[in-house]
């Protein structure tokens, strides 16, 4: 009753199924797309080269659904929500941290509070572009997925 499972191994859906069957509380944080230390796009060159597995773009974070994991969800399952993880052993500066988080953290937030039937990536893109002025105002070094060459990747 007090156990919370953080499910991150999307390649092992049978483990999620066991947790669902045992009625554990579950937070979904699958590596693909919820590991924010993975590259955001193919232009990234520094740090761990996760591109051989996947780029975890803001679009993938935004569009992630529990239904992407092939399990049988009980009618009243205990999915508490979703979470993204950012492992920082290779992040040495605040700019690098910001770059890896933003705008994917905005995509995560909107994914978490928006019902599946109301998600619309085009509408989100309009709102996201407006966030960039706020990021600049707060000196957040973000990755601009619309013009990625204009927001160069920090080396570390």
What is each model feature region?
Residues 1-156:
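Substrate-binding groove of N-acetylhexosamine-processing glycoside hydrolases
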